[in-house]
Amino acid sequence: MDPFDAGAGGLLKQPKSVWATAGASVVAFMGIGLVDPILPSIAQGLNATASQVSLLFTSYFLITAVAMLVTGFVSSRIGGKKTLLLGLAFVVVFAGLAGTSGSVGELVGFRAGWGLGNALFVSTALAVIVGAAAGGSAAAILLYESALGLGMACGPLLGALLGNASWRYPFFGTAFLMAVGFLCITVFLKEQPKPARKTSLLDPLKALGHGGLASVAVSAFFYNYTFFTVLAFTPFVLNMTPYKSGAVFFAWGVLLAVFSVIVAPRLQKRFGSLKVLGGSLVLLAADVLVLGYGSHTTAVVCTILSGAFIGVNNTVYTELALGVSDAPRPVASAGYNFVRWFAAAAAPFFAPKIEEWTDIHIPFVVAAVTAVAGAAVVVVRRKALTHEAEELEPKHATEDGVTVFAN
């Protein structure tokens, strides 16, 4: 079934619980790109260097990566709804505290707590949407990717609008919006059935013993380094006002959303997932290389254009991670995310450090190399990825229900 079908199983005809979860997911993803337009302002306001301020991303995603081992353990014991609410509560508290920070150290610490909340919420939200959405897992994944794209687009916009007055306001704004999400989840989402089997802390690591899933995770690790070099380091290179930087990353996020939800499925249908992923990674590598060596205008254009390739990659990686192994989807997703988020933590730290050690161009050269490395993994492991995913598709089709709530 086409997930965009206007029938009963169409993408837009969903229960209130799905819309409440998706809406809160938008705000959760806004928190990732929220700080982009205000990174220079934070550096100026707290007398910090670019590498110090970039730790806002590093602490956030380092905790998110480790928390992936915990999310399934928690949600399989207390249920999906309570896990979502726990995650939202963490975000509300730590986002609010981030706005009160008096030093970079405090802000980095509060962002780490924020990352824990976001991990609990975002990973569980995908499972909840898959289990409750009309139209099956294809529609659910597209709905989730829509929330991701919209959040990535609106996060920088909110950061720019509120951050132009003070870098503190975007954090308070996020806390308020997540509090609204907390109320919506409380009212509209019914308590979800717990899975028949409780997830252990080691299950995601054991799942990575599967060659196909490990290959997807390693490829995504390299890709995420490129992704977050663009997201976390480019604002310092562009060196624009919050409004202008917000506009650039809003356009970037719009392309990300459009290519995630509309373009990627059509490309996959025509060319196949692995060819699309490999080609998109190579194009992303070329894009960031031009970004690093081009003029300021060229850098702006390439930053926006990268959203298209990132959108395609996100959709294909998500589908591969959920379908390539014989592990339950939630466990496979947790193992996959555990690996790839470490790159999201590494890139914001190393990119400005590499600039300090060399020059402003080399971080983008490294990012281009990692994108190509991700494509190389896909090419080398293409047979295992293709055959195993096709063989396991019927098995995973039976898992779309209460068993996914361990994620």
Where are these regions (language model features)?
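Cytoplasmic helix-loop-helix junction between adjacent transmembrane helices
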Residues: F110-L150
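A late C-terminal transmembrane helix in Major Facilitator Superfamily
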Residues: V324-I360
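C-terminal transmembrane helical hairpin of 12-TM major facilitator-type secondary transporters
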Residues: L274-Y317
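C-terminal membrane-cytosol helix-exit motif in multi-pass small-molecule transporters
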Residues: A175-K194, V377-R382
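Juxtamembrane intracellular "pre-TM" segments in multi-pass secondary transporters
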Residues: D2-L12, K190-V216, G401
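Helix-loop-helix hairpin linking two adjacent transmembrane segments in secondary transporters
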Residues: G135, L142-T186
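Conserved MFS/SLC helix-loop-helix module at the cytosolic interface between two early adjacent transmembrane helices
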Residues: A65-G102
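Helix-to-loop junctions at the C-terminal end of transmembrane segments
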Residues: M68-G79, F259-G272, E355
